[in-house]
Regions:
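Hydrophobic single-pass membrane-insertion segments
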Residues: 76, 80, 94-112
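Hydrophobic alpha-helical targeting segments used for export or membrane insertion
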Residues: 88-94
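Short, hydrophobic alpha-helical membrane anchors of single-pass surface/secreted proteins
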Residues: 79-88
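N-terminal targeting leaders characterized by basic, low-complexity, disordered sequences
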Residues: 1-75
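A surface/extracellular/periplasmic glyco- and lipid-processing/surface-interacting theme
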Residues: 71, 81-82, 118-170, 177-422
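Ser/Thr/Pro/Gly-rich low-complexity linker/stalk segments immediately outside membranes or between
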Residues: 104-126
């Protein structure tokens, strides 16, 4: 705010020379306010009628102006005179303060005779864009608008080690058939150029892909899965009908040798009009590492060869994955798969009518375990329909927030177990 440019009040007019001296009447113990000469060069003093008298002011009829200030002026004043002078000074200070407050002080509320002050607002740091799939910050905002693509990744012994899993944003793990697990790996901002091996689809993997509005890359599927893909409007990227987006490597025998890249998958998505994905993301948060209470984690999904183990890494606040007693690594980078969040969803598990394929009751609700920041939180998962997103709540019914980064979700049958130790 600007100070009011109005001129202050005119100084008080000095009295005429003949009026500057007032007689101090000792009879009524009152003293008028001494005032300096107009030119400010002289100081008013009191003349003594009799220097030997006990009271130097007793016979004063008129004060005498002395051009030289005597050094012991205040010592020659009585206590009462000093009090009177102090009171006058205090009154002047108070009066001056009141004049400033009510007359000279700028009026912030008044728009009259004021100049608006233009204050440059400090630029608020712009929030960085984040991935809807993983919650991680992105260097390029356009990556957040990429379509989500899901790929069915095999996990048999002949398929290990796989390629591209370290780049997946979310991975769902469940049994395909015969106790052999399979992964649905979802990608958005990350674009690995060597992914596989890719295998066939199952109905519950479709239920995991639908809430993310994801394209589904697969090589055929069970009869029920193929019917669901057609009837539920899944974005179908089946290798059977889109072979230009896939290839087979010679280092592995069929059917463990189908691979793809995002250069090819992006072109396939574009050709089908799958340019973005609209979905409800999981609620994310920043890491808040705790004193570890759940560092060694085991899920009894199937036999030991397919039951994963996760070991908490305090340095990176991640969980290193192993299976069959061997570190689970990416074939392309050699890096061990290390998600930020590990989740076990407990579901009723059964057998399909063909007596071969596995089924899961993946709608409704059930118990869940969330491992992040070195601790475990027990809560509830809920999914109202095949197309709807999973909702994760804690023991108080509040939405559970997940660390930003890769999230690994294992489906654990209700007859199996989840174990963890500090």
């Amino acid at each position: 705010d600007q100070i009011n440019n109005d001129s202050p009040d005119e100084p008080l007019k000095q009295p005429a020379a003949e009026d500057q001296i007032e007689t101090i009447n000792l009879a009524d113990d009152s003293v008028s306010n001494p005032v300096t000469e107009a030119d400010g060069s002289n100081v008013e003093t009191l003349a003594e009628a009799d220097k030997s008298a006990a009271n130097p002011l007793a016979d004063i009829e008129k004060p005498v102006t002395d051009s030289a200030q005597k050094p012991n002026f205040f010592k020659r004043l009585s206590k009462k005179q000093l009090l009177i002078i102090a009171g006058i000074v205090a009154a002047l200070l108070i009066g001056g303060g009141l004049v400033y407050w009510f007359v000279l002080k700028p009026d912030n509320k008044s728009s009259t005779n004021t100049t608006p002050v233009v204050t440059a607002n400090k630029a608020t740091p712009k929030a960085k864009p984040t991935s809807p799939l993983t919650g991680v910050e992105l260097s390029d905002a356009s990556l957040a608008n990429r379509p989500v693509t899901g790929l069915m990744i095999e996990n048999s012994g002949d398929a290990r080690p796989q390629s591209g899993l370290t780049d997946a944003g979310i991975v769902f793990e469940a049994i395909a058939e015969g106790g052999i697990t399979r992964f649905l790996a979802l990608f958005q901002e990350s674009q690995p150029q060597y992914i596989g091996p890719i295998r066939s689809a199952r109905p519950y993997y479709i239920d995991f892909a639908l809430p993310f509005d994801a394209g589904l890359g697969h090589v055929g599927g069970s009869p029920d899965a193929l019917n669901d893909i057609k009837n539920l409007g899944v974005r179908d990227l089946d290798e059977f009908y889109n072979s230009q987006a896939y290839w087979r490597i010679t280092e592995r025998a069929a059917p463990h040798n189908v691979y793809s890249s995002f250069a090819k998958l992006d072109a396939l998505n574009q050709s089908k009009g799958y340019t973005s994905s609209k979905f409800t993301p999981f609620t994310r948060k920043k890491d808040v590492p705790q004193t570890p209470t759940a560092s060694s984690i085991d899920f009894s999904i199937s036999s030991s060869f397919y039951s994963p183990h996760f070991q908490y890494n305090t340095a990176t606040n991640t969980y290193k994955r192993s299976e069959g007693g061997v570190a689970h690594v990416d074939a392309q980078t050699g890096a061990q798969i290390s998600p930020k969040v590990v989740i076990a969803l407990v579901m009723n598990q059964g057998l399909a009518s063909d007596g071969d394929h596995t089924t899961y009751q993946d709608t409704g609700s059930g118990k869940m375990y969330v491992f992040q920041d070195g601790i475990v939180s027990v809560g509830t998962w809920a999914k109202s329909s095949r197309q709807s997103q999973f909702v994760f709540t804690d023991k108080n019914g509040l939405t559970m927030k997940l660390n930003a980064g890769q999230t690994w979700i294992s489906i654990v049958g209700s007859a199996s177990y989840v174990s963890y130790t500090p």
